[in-house]
Amino acid sequence: MKDRHRILLAPLVPFLLLSCQSAPPAAAPQSAPAATAEKPRKVILISLDGASAQTLHQLHKDGALTAGGFERFFRDGQVADRMLPVNPTITAVNHISLVTGYPPAQTGIVSNTFHPAGAPFLDTVSGFAAPIETETLWESVSRQGKKVGVLGWPGADAKGSRRTADWGILWQSDPEREPALVTLKRSDWSPMPAGAATEGLVTHAPLLRSRAIIGKEGQTGREFEFLAVDRTDDGKVNYDAILPLTAGDRVFIQPGQWAHLPCQVPRRDQIIRSTFCWVKVLSLDPDLGTAQIYFNGQYGNSAYPRTFEMTLGEEGLQWTGQADDHNLGEGWKGHPGIDLTTWTEQTERFTTYLGAALRLAAGRSDWDLILGYMPAIDDAGHELLLTDPAQPGFTTERRDALAAARLKVWQSVDRELNSFLATVDLKTTAVVIVSDHGMAPVHTKIDPNVLLRDKSLLTAGPDFKPAAGTRAYTTTSGGVAEVYVDPAAPDRDRLIADLKTYFSAWSEAGKHPIAQALTRHEGAPLGLDHPNSGDLILFAADGYTFGSGGLKAGHALMPTEVYGMHGYVNTDLRMASIYMAVGAGVKPGKPGANGVVRNVDVAGQVSAWLGLEKPRAKPE
């Protein structure tokens, strides 16, 4: 889901430029899975962001998914060979098409970031927040008298009546308190006087106390006190655990272990909230030469109505947030940060939370349709898809370690699906699992704005963003970039034609990083002929991704900051997404034509299972 360009991978090997491959033409439409006309039933539609059809079928063939979640669909339901995403194969675009049944040319959501037609020339908008020009499933189902719950689905952010269901959980990217890594040296510890906090505490070395201060200055709950404890009676000073001085039972944290500690966090409304914080001891020298303590980012639940948010808290469910990509990247560069194990544990924990929230939601009685969302597989693809020797930092050992971590993430999703299916009555409910796109390895980032600046078409401001005087600029989302030309530019049509020729022919070191440059009209067969689309639409070549940062760095090509990306033309089989269904009204076997389902047919199939008409081309 995340348009993430936040971590820098250690550039252990020079990045290599791979040969360009022209993208094939868009595939012909495939038939939808057969809709039924049976009695209405309930439907649960869950998106596993970034789940590749190729990877799913390979893992199933290898017997690597053993928890029973995915297997239930293969055994009792429908599993498509692949689902054809809409273009571009980007998160916001495909999630909106999944819940509307329309391509970007009709929804108006043409990328994760784009320039909205009619707005001031330099204005851009997030595809996750932009107005949707067609009716969505939550609108359509509500209009027809049914109830809908939405758990984090892109576009359903409750910012206006058209973006609000009957109840739901809202997606949170920004923590109330940022994650923090505290490094304590031997000089940071001092003797702990005897008192109530140490009563009955057994240690075989002097008790020492230290403090960790996290969060923003002036915030409440920033300070944590710890004791260093030696629990081994070996006649040596050998500190082996940290004891947080918090309320409740004593919790000894050894290196490599997490603890769930009582803490206080200031909410965005400045009210102090008593909650629990996840804390991990990353390392602890026996002599306390260095101790590293990591604090997970802190979030509260954001759900509606208020009674549902309270229920989440009563059930002990607390939003944990996605894994800490930034500190993983810092660790990979040799700076203080987290390791791969910690990142994977965070990803598994968030998946567990979302699975528990889905089970709680399905246990409610006030719904006919539930939309759910899990980003773990996408996160692992972006951060861990190290398969190409041309990628920064590639070694076979690192490739294998990251592959093992990606498998663990798939297996954690498998466990949650199995637990979820055990709570659902499949005699009355159809469960549908989809994804928005697959993933491909990348090694080099392209910033097209550098090329436009070099042609004197873009003026960069002090923040290295397009500023006044710019006649052309790009927005980028992975494998796709939109080029916008000022409507007031002299001889505008000729300029667009010249830029098309330039981008199509541009090369570096004999390589062509841009596979295609299409005019908006030429993008019509790809479903992209909408006023929000760029005057030119660029698709990156194999191994390349578009991004920003070049205006500051001073060059158009840079080593990529992530290992996996999407956004390429949907006929690239690596971009193929998944479609699975099981339960009421679902005929076992392969759905679609020749095992292929289209993204834009999902909303209609869900509506048919509900006994309703599909979303309309224009909202009321």
Model-predicted regions and their roles:
Residues 79-99, 151-160, 373-377, 438, ...:
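Short, solvent-exposed turn/loop segments enriched in Gly/Ser/Thr/Pro and often Arg
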Residues 134, 190-195, 199-290, 299, ...:
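Active-site neighborhoods of enzymes that stabilize oxyanions during catalysis
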Residues 17-19:
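C-terminal motif of bacterial Sec signal peptides marking the signal peptidase cleavage site
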